[in-house]
Each structure stands twice: as structure tokens, then as C-alpha cells.
Design a protein with these regions (language model features):
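Basic, Lys/Arg-enriched alpha-helical interface segments
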Residues: 1-64, 73-79, 86-101
Length: 101
């Protein structure tokens, strides 16, 4: 998969250095995957949720951090829409809904 907006990961790691290993592992796995469906993602990331509108939520570091991405399976494209703490995600989810992030 191709990850668009990878810079967001680097910026987040600078703010939250404790996430470096987990986010590097996530990025490595995503880059080396060729997902064609949600079922393919679930095989690798059991805790991922499909929230609608082509958006998927990944739990990072035991659900302390979240990444929301748009995935275009036909072109192997992952676009990072949000990365933040669980609390930040919950606040945003209540305000606009995860499928609109």
C-alpha cells in the first residue's frame, strides 16, 4: 500500500516520542501490504474498525492512540486523515463522527 501524508506520522512521533516504535511498525506493515478488502486488513490488524465512508480506525499502543485513514483498495492507497490520542479521537468522533474525519 502507498501511504499518503506520511509526514503526519513523523510530526506525531515528535510530539509523542513513546509512539515511535508502534507507528514505525504500523507504517512498515501497511507499506508491505496489498489489501483488497476490509477482511484483508483484519487478518493483520485485528482491532481495526471500519467506520464508513471508506474510513478505518487503527488502535495504536493498546488503544492509547488512534489513526483514521481513508483506504482506496483498487489503487492500494492509504490517506491518513487523523492521528491523535484516544481522548482526542473520542472528542472528534462525538463532534463530527469518525466517518466524517
Amino acid at each position: 500500500m502507498r501511504i499518503f501524508t506520511e509526514q503526519a506520522l513523523s510530526e506525531y512521533i515528535q510530539k509523542h516520542p513513546e509512539t515511535k516504535t508502534a507507528l514505525q511498525e504500523w507504517k512498515y506493515v501497511v507499506r508491505h501490504s496489498e489489501w483488497t478488502s476490509f477482511a484483508d486488513i483484519k487478518k493483520v490488524f485485528n482491532s481495526v474498525d471500519a467506520v464508513g465512508n471508506q474510513r478505518y480506525v487503527f488502535n495504536i499502543m493498546g488503544n492509547h492512540h488512534r489513526i483514521v485513514v481513508v483506504i482506496k483498495f483498487t489503487i492500494y492507497f492509504v490517506y491518513i486523515r487523523f492521528i491523535g490520542t484516544h481522548t482526542e479521537y473520542e472528542r472528534m468522533n462525538k463532534t463530527i463522527g469518525a466517518k466524517n474525519i
